[in-house]
């Protein structure tokens, strides 16, 4: 029987405004954001906190004080927060990190893997040591985090895991220097899909966010947002089509919306995937890319 007594089709399918708002709320949830010191990681942590979650944050660099500043911003919202140093490529560090968060928060409802390491060398010129460093953080680290946190979520029969992949993980790059990044990000995309299969029966959703161009703290996106198709003016030599396609300066010209994404726009996607608003979404690579992959 589809309807309960006194219910009609209209009042079943039309939620109230309060119900819609509550679906996006993270009030009472406990989140762990990995790689939250700056840029997108910081934005994700603050976004989850604004939606109501208590947020633990971690980074390999804690000495600069930036991570503690993010934690202070979260606490200023009347949320709980702790800032912890961890090398997620090290299994012992990951175990200690998760244990500390659970001791402080009681559980982990949301895991966001955002940590990233770049290397300027082309994939064809990369040496074995550099490749190992890249994969240890960008791939092994994500795997270690999921392996350590998922048993907690299995025990409580709920959870949301969100990985950061990229447009680079979804199509090959003309720019050789992006090759190693693309290979690793494609691995994260498949890791997301595989864990969706394994953890779905335990009511744990596993998704990924795939941005295209996103503002940096050094290059804010607000002006770009207001002025479509405007780029930084500076002298430059004539570029090839491949360089034009991949360049930070001209890249927005190849995005239908004509601009880079702001941190707030990225955070909105994270809140959606972490919340009950996406309760039937798992195994998805969410392109937050201004139409780049269209």
Please place each PLM-identified region on the residue numbering.
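Short C-terminal tail/terminal secondary-structure segment
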Residues: 3-22, 259, 270-271, 282-294
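Alpha-helical segment proximal to the catalytic Tyr-Lys
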Residues: 151, 197-198, 279
């Amino acid at each position: 029987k589809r309807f309960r007594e006194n219910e009609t089709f209209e009042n079943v399918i039309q939620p109230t405004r309060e119900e819609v708002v509550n679906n996006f709320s993270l009030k009472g949830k406990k989140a762990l954001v990995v790689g939250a010191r700056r840029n997108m990681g910081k934005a994700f942590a603050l976004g989850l906190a604004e939606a109501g979650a208590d947020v633990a944050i971690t980074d390999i660099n804690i000495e600069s004080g930036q991570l503690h500043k993010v934690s202070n911003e979260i606490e200023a919202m009347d949320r709980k927060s702790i800032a912890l140093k961890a090398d997620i490529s090290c299994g012992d560090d990951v175990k200690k990190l998760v244990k500390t968060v659970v001791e402080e928060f009681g559980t982990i409802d949301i895991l966001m893997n955002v940590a990233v390491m770049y290397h300027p060398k082309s994939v064809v010129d990369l040496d074995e040591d550099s490749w190992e460093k890249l994969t240890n953080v960008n791939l092994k680290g994500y795997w270690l985090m999921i392996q350590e946190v998922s048993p907690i979520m299995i025990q409580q029969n709920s959870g949301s895991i969100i990985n950061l992949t990229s447009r680079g993980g979804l199509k090959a790059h003309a720019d050789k220097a992006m090759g190693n990044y693309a290979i690793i990000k494609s691995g994260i995309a498949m890791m997301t899909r595989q864990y969706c299969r394994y953890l779905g029966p335990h009511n744990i959703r596993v998704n990924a966010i795939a941005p295209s161009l996103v503002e940096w703290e050094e290059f804010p996106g607000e002006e770009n947002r207001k002025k479509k198709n405007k780029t930084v003016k500076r002298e430059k030599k004539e570029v090839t089509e491949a360089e034009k396609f991949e360049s930070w300066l001209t890249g927005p010209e190849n995005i239908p919306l004509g601009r880079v994404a702001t941190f707030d726009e990225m955070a909105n996607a994270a809140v959606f995937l972490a919340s009950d608003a996406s309760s039937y979404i798992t195994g998805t690579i969410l392109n937050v890319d201004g139409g780049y992959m269209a």
